[in-house]
């Protein structure tokens, strides 16, 4: 009887010390990202609301939604970025073969979206010169004069989008797009 009891105790201890289920260890614990902040953008005397949401449970189905609303609540910019596109257009040296790494990568993009260096005050400096990455030279010159602020965000490894408010056209436009 003692031998049987000893065998049961040792077996129990042995099983308790086994590592957990590998699939369970690789499971991704992810919460949707929902952040917002206010900054002057369309008007130097008012605060617009910048909002980002990262929704979805699997990287291929995730969507990063970014919008800007004027102080009065009117939406002036809205873009949806697919998680699969963000993953596909990244540094080829970055190993994103595992779903867990893809989720971490997308969450990092969302968490860093409102980094201070993405807010450009002003969007264009008076001494700046338009180059081949400026899609709208008229807007670029308008921004030099208005001194309105800009915002940049990344679409991929070498694809940054710079946006600003055009007082003349009363809408947000891309004023620079490059590396």
What are these regions (language model features)?
Residues 2-8:
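Sec-dependent signal peptide recognition
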Residues 13-16:
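C-terminal motif of bacterial Sec signal peptides marking the signal peptidase cleavage site
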Residues 18-21:
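Bacterial signal peptide processing site
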Residues 27-28:
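Acidic, negatively charged sequence signal
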Residues 36-141:
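Surface-exposed acidic loop/strand-edge motifs in secreted or periplasmic proteins
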Residues 53-55, 149-154:
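Short beta-strand segments that buttress and anchor functional surface loops
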Residues 151-170:
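Short, exposed beta-strand-loop hairpins at the edges of beta-sheets
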Residues 178-179:
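Short, solvent-exposed mixed-charge patches
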């Amino acid at each position: 009887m003692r031998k049987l009891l000893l065998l049961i105790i040792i077996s129990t201890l042995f099983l308790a010390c086994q590592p957990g289920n590998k699939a369970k260890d690789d499971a991704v614990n992810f919460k949707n990202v929902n952040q917002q902040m206010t900054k002057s953008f369309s008007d130097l005397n008012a605060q617009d609301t910048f909002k980002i949401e990262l929704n979805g449970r699997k990287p291929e189905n995730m969507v990063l939604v970014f919008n800007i609303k004027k102080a009065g609540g009117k939406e002036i910019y809205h873009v949806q970025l697919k998680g699969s596109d963000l993953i596909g257009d990244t540094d080829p040296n970055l190993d994103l073969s595992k779903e867990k790494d893809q989720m971490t990568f997308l969450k990092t993009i969302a968490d860093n979206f409102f980094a201070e260096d993405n807010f450009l005050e002003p969007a264009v400096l008076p001494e700046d010169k338009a180059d081949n990455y400026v899609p709208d030279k008229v807007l670029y010159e308008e921004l030099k004069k208005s001194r309105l602020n800009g915002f940049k965000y990344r679409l991929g490894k070498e694809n940054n989008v710079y946006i600003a408010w055009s007082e003349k056209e009363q809408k947000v436009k891309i004023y620079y797009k490059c590396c």
